[in-house]
């Protein structure tokens, strides 16, 4: 699905809103359980830091507004302050240290070009408040069978799934993280490799509308006959998702 893109590289079969909303809902209400004075009028605003500024990050910010309004607006309790970090900030370790100290909810909504490099080191996790929650929307997996090793954007956190997406600091899942990864500093983590599946009915309504054009092509054409130069945008997108196209691009690079 990641490779099913239009001529401008924008995904055509995707539910950014559903992905981000499901994730933020889980992370926000996990923070509610743990943050001191969460429902107090006397505290300052809840500080949220989002890594990334793409579609997923933007929808995460909108979802934060939604759940903040639900919880706080009519009660006159301070809501959330959202900071979104582009690469011109995440590339500077000295800036991230201070940002982490002032973050209650850290959200990874990044899309890295190089998955062998961390954005937030495990040492930086140590600067987060003890009550902070890490929300992993991107949910990139570790893969120590590759050389160099594929890692997550935030070092030392587990990756969840639909069966389990909330991890305490002593969770057994940490034992499954590659030994070369530093897991010394830990906070509660909310992570899922299939966020749209948390609210499946709403997600399927979106996919139902998007997938019809692709199915129409597949019902009329054999996969081997897909044409990148077709006048049909759905056919061109399907071709870009084939192994043949991927391998051809890889060889060109």
Language-model features: where?
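Glycine-rich phosphate/diphosphate-binding loops and the adjacent beta-loop-alpha structural elements
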Residues: 45-46, 111-115, 195-196
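Residue-level recognition of the N-termini of beta-strands and the immediately preceding loop/turn
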Residues: 44-48, 132-135, 187
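Short, acidic Gly/Pro/Ser/Thr-rich loop/turn segments
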Residues: 57-58, 114, 142, 197
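Glycine-rich phosphate/diphosphate-binding loop of Rossmann-like nucleotide-binding domains
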Residues: 26-110
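Conserved active-site and cofactor/substrate-binding residues in soluble primary-metabolism enzymes
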Residues: 18-22, 51, 55, 59, ...
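Adenosine-phosphate binding glycine-rich loop
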Residues: 2-41, 139-253
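Rossmann-like adenosine-cofactor binding region
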Residues: 84-181
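Fold-independent oxyanion-binding glycine-rich loops
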Residues: 1-3, 53, 87, 109-110, ...
């Amino acid at each position: 699905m990641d490779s099913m893109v239009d001529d401008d590289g924008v995904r055509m079969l995707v539910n950014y809103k559903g992905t981000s909303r499901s994730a933020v809902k889980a992370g926000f209400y996990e923070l509610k359980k743990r943050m001191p004075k969460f429902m107090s009028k006397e505290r300052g605003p809840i500080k949220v830091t989002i890594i990334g500024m793409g579609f997923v990050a933007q929808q995460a910010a909108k979802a934060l507004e939604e759940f903040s309004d639900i919880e706080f607006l009519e009660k006159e309790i301070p809501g959330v302050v959202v900071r979104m970090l582009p690469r011109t900030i995440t590339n500077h370790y000295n800036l991230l240290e201070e940002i982490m100290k002032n973050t209650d909810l850290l959200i990874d909504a990044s899309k890295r070009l190089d998955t062998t490099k961390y954005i937030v080191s495990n040492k930086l996790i140590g600067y987060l408040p003890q009550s902070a929650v890490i929300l992993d929307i991107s949910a990139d997996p570790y893969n120590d069978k590759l050389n160099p090793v594929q890692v997550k954007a935030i070092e030392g956190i587990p990756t969840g799934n639909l069966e389990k997406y909330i991890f305490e600091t002593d969770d057994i899942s940490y034992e499954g993280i590659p030994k070369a990864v530093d897991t010394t500093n830990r906070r509660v983590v909310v992570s899922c490799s299939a966020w749209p599946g948390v609210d499946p009915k709403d997600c399927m309504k979106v996919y139902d509308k998007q997938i019809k054009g692709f199915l129409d092509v597949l019902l009329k054409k054999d996969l081997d006959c897909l044409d990148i130069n077709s006048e049909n945008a759905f056919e061109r997108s399907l071709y870009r998702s084939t192994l043949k196209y991927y391998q051809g691009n890889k060889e060109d690079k």
